[in-house]
């Protein structure tokens, strides 16, 4: 059995120890949860999760891998992933990369081995909560103090929305799209 190498620290002082995957980087964000059984690639690349650390309640994530065609946006902007177990060797004919490989490439940390259902209950009972995924060797008290001082962004829509109009010339019917959160990718 491997020994723990990462920790999730919540602003209320709760510390969860787990196993690292993805980028070896400390990032803070609002901890949220997703109860879907599938669609983890779409979730990690969904602009609506900008600045958030996403907890998946389904027990095994990454089993069908990642492929370029299923990204919701070109530049995912989540701050981290929390899973019970991450699949190291995905199996699907469309698999191009493992979840671990993609998170490393995108510089997003992940932590596994966490009781995600317990964490989800905490979020449901207490509401919005900040958290940070960091190496286990980092002092939890110091990380907690820094986390409490961290201001999370409040302009997420501005960060992920297009700043200019796009025109597409063509024949046939004319269509107008008003962007209230359209995904690109």
Q: Language-model features: where?
A:
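RNA-binding accessory domains that recognize and position tRNA/RNA substrates
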Residues: 1-185
